[in-house]
């Protein structure tokens, strides 16, 4: 092989190393071969970590998380994580104490997971649950959808038997595993073998699906609300529906309406429409609480402390600083409190509270929002679900 051909081959693929023991015509040729050998050796060492890359470390995942919440530079987020020894919550606070990064860019962050959300009203209660898996292929499988459908029925039956209300991913979701699993109670289903019968539990059926799909199948978040009085209107909304009551995101909503039973007879469609519109807004705007008074006290105190720290270098009288803090807190409330948010389903720039008042005046109703929960597969709200909400 001619020398120039061997040189080009070496530069393109990084192999083989040129032999140095052979005789070349002059010292310049030998020097070229020696330089190429050094270059190829360095290239091989540089490529080796790329070819055998390890999964993203916990530090990189935390770095992505902090940056997504604060939108600060990677260097600032990295320094904050190092200073806080990997504590994500403290790192977010530290970054936001800077005047440039004091505002939340987003209270929702992406989570790498797939699955479905199901929600249904039954009698005096409404339930919403999330079933998670590793791939979209499994999440759209009929057996997986059937499991979510049947689990909804089991959750409603279990809630009717035991009562109470629960929201979260802890004991409430765990309690579902021991419920009886009966596909007949969960609605119709298409054919195919299954092990469901009267003695099967939800946990056993879930293990059965894991063995079939060779993927993790687990119950994520779970919420149940039981009607407290006859004036509470229970509503659920499912977005990107796979079938009725099942989709990729959902909202559980409770409204209080004076003289509900009488109003439903004459204005049932109007009430259902406003409940659906309110659920759509909640899904889009992702509020944390209904009103300012419903916000957790520790969240408010933390926010005030972060804002004051960000204003520490401002040379202003105390009264003006207090006004600046109040102004920033109003902006914070307008992003995380439902009644303070700008209504997203029209361009009138009205607050949600004003939209409700206008609707009540128009239809001679008295409506207030009592409670809501929002589940979006692949997203979590850091003020409700951590780390900031912890």
UniProtKB/Swiss-Prot annotation:
* GO cellular component annotations of the record: mitochondrion
| Record flagged with keyword Protein biosynthesis | yes
Pfam family of the protein (one) = EF_TS
Keywords assigned by UniProt? Elongation factor, Mitochondrion, Protein biosynthesis
The answer, when asked if Mitochondrion is one of the entry's keywords, is yes
What the entry lists under SUPFAM superfamilies is as follows: Elongation factor Ts (EF-Ts), dimerisation domain (SSF54713), UBA-like (SSF46934)
Per UniProt, subcellular location reads as: Mitochondrion
Record's miscellaneous remark: This protein may be expected to contain an N-terminal transit peptide but none has been predicted.
What's this protein's name? Answer: Elongation factor Ts, mitochondrial
UniProt organism field: Plasmodium vivax (strain Salvador I)
